[in-house]
């Protein structure tokens, strides 16, 4: 498929090592864009397919790469992998410009996540189809949030009309 050759080095079986050839292509391409006055948009999470070899539960292997993107919003290990990659890429020195991507003024902006969000994942049914290990983790995070937001079960019930449905006065997010 179109994402087979990408920034991750497949020889390691994970997505934690960068592919030197792909990185060189990116470096050269961005240097040529810069030479021609064209700014760069770096995307940190586009078609990365996480695997169990990344240190994640093996259930990740059964998920579509696009659906995996929602996990970074509530699975701490995925968020850490995203930060690790961001640091690797943004602190890498482009040999053609002599600058890191973090310091290169030709990098106009960096997209943390491309075309995905927690609400989008929920509306698109991704949340409903999560493997149990990730669904349980989301449930734990949700309950922690509710515990912090509402001082008691009674306050929670009042805000959600005691029926599990949020009242018109309560905040959804």
Which residue stretches match the model-derived regions?
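Active-site mouth of glycoside hydrolases
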Residues: 1-173
């Amino acid at each position: 498929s179109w994402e087979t050759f990408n920034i991750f080095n497949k020889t390691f079986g994970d997505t934690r090592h960068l592919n030197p050839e792909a990185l060189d292509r990116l470096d050269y391409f961005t240097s040529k864009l810069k030479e021609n006055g064209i700014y760069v948009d770096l995307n940190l999470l586009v078609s990365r397919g996480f695997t169990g070899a990344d240190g994640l539960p093996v259930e990740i292997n059964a998920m579509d790469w696009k659906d995996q993107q929602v996990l970074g919003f509530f699975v701490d290990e995925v968020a850490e992998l995203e930060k690790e990659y961001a640091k690797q890429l943004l602190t890498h020195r482009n040999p053609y410009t002599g600058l890191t991507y973090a310091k290169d003024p030709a990098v106009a902006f960096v997209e943390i996540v491309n075309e995905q969000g927690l609400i989008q994942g929920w509306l698109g049914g991704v949340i409903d189809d999560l493997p149990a290990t990730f669904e349980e983790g989301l449930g734990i995070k949700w309950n922690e949030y509710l515990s912090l937001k509402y001082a008691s079960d009674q306050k929670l019930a009042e805000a959600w009309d005691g029926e599990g449905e949020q009242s018109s006065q309560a905040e959804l997010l």
